C-alpha cells in the first residue's frame, strides 16, 4: 500500500532500543500538551521524546519516510502504542506518536502539542517503530 507516493512493505521488524523507553517517551510528550514551542518541529519533538539530544540525520519527515521506506521499515494498519505515525496533512508529511486506539500525540498542524484521533488528521498514513538510526 502507500502513503502518498511511498510503497509500503509489510514485514516484521523488532522493536528498537531507544535511550528513553516507550512509556517514558509518551509521558514526556503528554507533559508538553498545550505547548506551542514545538510548532513545525514534529520530527525533532519525537526524536527528543525518545531520548535523542542530537539531530536525527533526516532533514524532515518526508526524508525520514523515504529512508524508512527504502529500508522496508514502514507498516500499514492500526499503529501500536509508541509507534511513530507518518501522515499526510496538507501538502506535507508529518509525524506523531501513537497512544493506541487510533489516537496520536505530538505538535499537530494547528500548533500546540495535542492528542488527536488520527482519522481526524489524515486517512493517508503509515507507521514505524520509533527508529532514529542516526540519533545519539
Pin down the residues of each PLM region.
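Secreted/periplasmic proteins that engage bacterial cell-wall peptidoglycan
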Residues: 1-90
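Aromatic- and glycine-rich peptidoglycan recognition patches
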Residues: 9-15, 26-34, 98-136
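Generic detector of ordered, mature protein regions
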Residues: 58-67, 92, 97-98, 111, ...
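Structural recognition of the beta-strand scaffold that forms the well-ordered cores
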Residues: 82-87, 95-98, 104-106
Amino acid at each position: 500500500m502507500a502513503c502518498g507516493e511511498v510503497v509500503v512493505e509489510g514485514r516484521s521488524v523488532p522493536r528498537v532500543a531507544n535511550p528513553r523507553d516507550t512509556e517514558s517517551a509518551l509521558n514526556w510528550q503528554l507533559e508538553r500538551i498545550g505547548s506551542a514551542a514545538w510548532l513545525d518541529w514534529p520530527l525533532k519533538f519525537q526524536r527528543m521524546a525518545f531520548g535523542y539530544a542530537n539531530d536525527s540525520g533526516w532533514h524532515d519527515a518526508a526524508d525520514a519516510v523515504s529512508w524508512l521506506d527504502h529500508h522496508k521499515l514502514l507498516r500499514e494498519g492500526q499503529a501500536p502504542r509508541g509507534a511513530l505515525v507518518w501522515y499526510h496533512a496538507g501538502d506535507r508529511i508529518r509525524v506523531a506518536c501513537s497512544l493506541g486506539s487510533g489516537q496520536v500525540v505530538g505538535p499537530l498542524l494547528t500548533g500546540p502539542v495535542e492528542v488527536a484521533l488520527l482519522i481526524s488528521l489524515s486517512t493517508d498514513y503509515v507507521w514505524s517503530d520509533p527508529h532514529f538510526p542516526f540519533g545519539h
